[in-house]
């Protein structure tokens, strides 16, 4: 994996998951059942040049919802996740 990119899994934004199950954003910014396509659109809107890897599976839940997104590293991972989460929330409302 290139060092100029961050790995983004849909589980990071899933309102149904606990932090222990892989959610990385606050419940106020999380969405129900985030789709890979939604994350891609939100990342494009933020200018993060997303690259999709559909064959990859989240290690904690290797048996469900395959796919991850690699985005440009433009700051800390936490700030990037918050930005994507806000964009996802905005698209859903």
From Swiss-Prot:
Q: Which UniProt keywords apply?
A: Cytoplasm, Ribonucleoprotein, RNA-binding, Signal recognition particle
Task: Give one Pfam family, short name only.
Answer: SRP19
A GO molecular function held by the record: 7S RNA binding
Record GO biological process: SRP-dependent cotranslational protein targeting to membrane, signal sequence recognition
List the InterPro entries hit by this protein, alphabetically: Signal_recog_particle_SRP19, SRP19-like_sf, SRP19_arc-type
List, alphabetically, the Gene3D superfamilies matched: Signal recognition particle, SRP19-like subunit
Q: Where in the cell is it found?
A: Cytoplasm
Please provide one cellular component term from the Gene Ontology annotations of this protein: signal recognition particle
The domain of life for this entry's organism is Archaea
- What's this protein's function? Involved in targeting and insertion of nascent membrane proteins into the cytoplasmic membrane. Binds directly to 7S RNA and mediates binding of the 54 kDa subunit of the SRP.
Give the record's subunit note: Part of the signal recognition particle protein translocation system, which is composed of SRP and FtsY. Archaeal SRP consists of a 7S RNA molecule of 300 nucleotides and two protein subunits: SRP54 and SRP19.
Q: Per the similarity annotation, which family is this?
A: Belongs to the SRP19 family.
Q: What is this protein called?
A: Signal recognition particle 19 kDa protein
Query: Which species is this record about?
Result: Methanothrix thermoacetophila (strain DSM 6194 / JCM 14653 / NBRC 101360 / PT)
């Amino acid at each position: 994996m290139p060092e100029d990119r961050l790995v983004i899994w849909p589980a990071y934004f899933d309102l149904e998951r606990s932090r222990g199950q892989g959610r990385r954003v606050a419940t106020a910014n999380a969405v129900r059942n985030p789709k890979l396509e939604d994350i891609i659109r939100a990342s494009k809107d933020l200018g993060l040049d997303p690259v999709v890897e559909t064959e990859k599976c989240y290690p904690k839940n290797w048996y469900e919802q395959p796919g991850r997104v690699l985005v440009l590293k433009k700051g800390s991972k936490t700030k990037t996740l918050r930005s994507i989460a806000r964009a996802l929330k905005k698209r859903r409302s």
